[in-house]
Amino acid sequence: APRSSQIVAQVRGLTHGYDEKTLFQNVNLQIDRSERVAMIGDNGCGKSTMMRLIQGREKPNNGEARLGDKELCKVNYFYQNQAEDLDGDVGVLETLVRAAPDEPLNQLKALLGRMAFNTSYHDRPVSYLSGGEKARLALAKFMVTPANVLFLDEPTNHLDIPSKQMLEEALRSFEGTVLAISHDRFFLRQIATRVLAFDEGKITDYEGDYAYYLSKNDKAGARDEILAAKKKEIEKTQIVSKSKMSKAEKAKLKKEKAKAFGSGSGKAKAKKNAGRWN
């Protein structure tokens, strides 16, 4: 996709809410090209609503929320439960072909391989997939759709670790603009260059990455340390479990991973995946 306008999103004097609950009160924001913005806060604080307002999917009560130049801003929106909207009668490979008809077929097949779909899945109807497989296919479909502005609402839900890492690498290599909602702090650490914290009708703008946000927010920093400690305990358990595997089991696991994700450097794959958007 071509470059977007310099101003990708603008919010002026925005006040918005539902019934008696006010989500935003006189909010002003500007998001520029190439920023990767994390939108964080408790459930129900208005993050998804803000995404819809900026895209024009919902009208504000007062004030303005809009994209920059709509002719130049090519938007791709990954919303929650997107996997549920996949056409169950269409095959796995055909789902990507319909999303990106100009993309070489071998490139689409390679992407499916990196998303752990071997050739036996290519003609399988989407309705036969598990919930996790549908989530991975929805992400693959998202990745092949050309865009220069990406809106992602909880994109890592139901993704396995390799798929999540591939998404992180692709987003870091992406030259366009990213707005991401996620409760996955480790994901946000990898991708964010700016943080918008939603809290009780206010949005605090941290013009730095997620580590910068933590350094300015004691409560969030303490919570992040607890989550990091829990993650280490889980990783230790996985290491112990893996050490108990037989040599044959380890060899089989290694072979399956190699088959699913192919060969080549991670950076090269990330650039190729990001290139589908750029």
Question: Could you say what each language-model-derived stretch is?
Answer:
Residues 3-278:
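ABC ATP-binding cassette signature C-motif
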